[in-house]
Amino acid sequence: MMYHIPGVLSPQDVARFREQLEQAEWVDGRVTTGAQGAQVKNNQQVDTRSTLYAALQNEVLNAVNQHALFFAAALPRTLSTPLFNRYQNNETYGFHVDGAVRSHPQNGWMRTDLSATLFLSDPQSYDGGELVVNDTFGQHRVKLPAGDLVLYPSSSQHCVPPVTRGVRVASFMWIQSMIRDDKKRAMLFELDNNIQSLKSRYGESEEILSLLNLYHNLLREWSEI
């Protein structure tokens, strides 16, 4: 399943990020890509050795960790270190699949269950550059407002078509979920959404408490901690 997570960063935060990224050191995006991806990747990334990068990636981690909808959809166990990329002048990233595991500075290795892109450019400011994802439901083309994030299974083939006008800047990361199975995770997300909707409409009740009990028992049964 694919999820749109709005408002991860406020407009003020986005503007500050963009201003700081204008001063960043950018390097060839292939430095963080395996052999397969390097053949189709042509973009730039912020140098991960820079002081600015360390500060910005911490802010992204704090923002996603505090976003209730992100947590409900991803049920994250481990988040990768966020990276930042830039596309301009017909730069592109052809169809590829993210690696199944990635190194992690604290945990050694992590499994990539979900991929996330946090958009930092106004969609009207550039042409092309949509995130194109192929999954069992067909092809999806995603171009969200700055500050919004999209979550999708890391097992999906995806690409970024050439940016023919303007500049597309984004942050991206991977998530190892407490729930490995996409279908089980989607069911828990739907159940959680319905519980929250019923609570806001009718207040607390024995029936809602029973559904909460069901949710947590399923999470307890399926989670890998």
Swiss-Prot record:
InterPro entries: Oxoglu/Fe-dep_dioxygenase_dom, PKHD_C, PKHD_hydroxylase, Pro_4_hyd_alph, Pro_4_hyd_alph_FE2OG_OXY. This is PKHD-type hydroxylase YbiX. GO terms for molecular function: 2-oxoglutarate-dependent dioxygenase activity; iron ion binding; L-ascorbic acid binding. It is an enzyme of class 1 (oxidoreductase). It comes from Shigella sonnei (strain Ss046). One of its GO terms (biological process) is intracellular iron ion homeostasis. Its EC number is 1.14.11.-. The gene is ybiX. Its cofactor is Fe(2+); L-ascorbate. Residues 78-177 form the Fe2OG dioxygenase domain. Keywords: Dioxygenase, Iron, Metal-binding, Oxidoreductase, Vitamin C.
